[in-house]
């Protein structure tokens, strides 16, 4: 599953939100969060946060460390 996440993020260099990854790969959202946390600890991924000022929403994008 981690390989699929890496491939998906490699195809989307601007990053993806957790829910987008979950829907695309068809895996349980909470299981995905555990995997993303593991991958961040392993140094494979990092999180980038930003606020969409127009909608006042916080976003967290997952990206590959390169």
Where would I find each of the regions flagged by the language model?
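Short amphipathic alpha-helical interaction segments
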Residues: 27-38
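Short, leucine-enriched amphipathic alpha-helices that occur as contiguous helical runs
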Residues: 2-6
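Short acidic, hydrophobic short linear motifs in intrinsically disordered regions
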Residues: 14-24
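Short, cationic-aromatic polyanion-contact patches
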Residues: 1, 17, 48-66
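Proline- and acidic/polar-enriched loop/turn elements at helix boundaries
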Residues: 21, 34, 51-52
């Amino acid at each position: 599953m981690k390989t699929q996440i890496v491939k998906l993020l490699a195809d989307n260099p601007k990053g993806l939100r957790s829910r987008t990854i979950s829907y695309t790969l068809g895996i349980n959202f909470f299981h995905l969060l555990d995997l993303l946390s593991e991958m961040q600890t392993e140094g494979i991924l990092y999180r980038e946060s930003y606020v969409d000022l127009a909608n006042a929403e916080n976003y967290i994008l997952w990206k590959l460390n390169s």
